[in-house]
């Protein structure tokens, strides 16, 4: 439905954040994880 590069980029980023957000947060937690490792 959207053709502009910006819109496509945002849609891809949204899909990645939704599908890979849980996995990323498990392997790369923000602050607490860096201290734990």
UniProtKB/Swiss-Prot annotation:
PROSITE patterns, sorted: CALCITONIN
Principal subcellular localisation of the protein: secreted
UniProt protein name: Calcitonin gene-related peptide 1
InterPro entries: Calcitonin-like (IPR021117), Calcitonin/adrenomedullin (IPR021116), Calcitonin_CS (IPR018360), Calcitonin_gene-rel_peptide (IPR015476), Calcitonin_peptide-like (IPR001693)
GO biological process: adenylate cyclase-activating G protein-coupled receptor signaling pathway; calcitonin gene-related peptide receptor signaling pathway
GO CC annotations, alphabetized: extracellular region
Taxonomic superkingdom: Eukaryota
GO molecular function, one term: hormone activity
Species whose genome carries this gene: Sus scrofa (Pig)
Protein's cellular compartments: Secreted
Keyword Secreted: yes
Family: Belongs to the calcitonin family.
UniProt gene name: CALCA
């Amino acid at each position: 439905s959207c053709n502009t590069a910006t819109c496509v980029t945002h849609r891809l980023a949204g899909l990645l954040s939704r599908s890979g957000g849980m996995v990323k947060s498990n392997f790369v937690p923000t602050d607490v994880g860096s201290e734990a490792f």
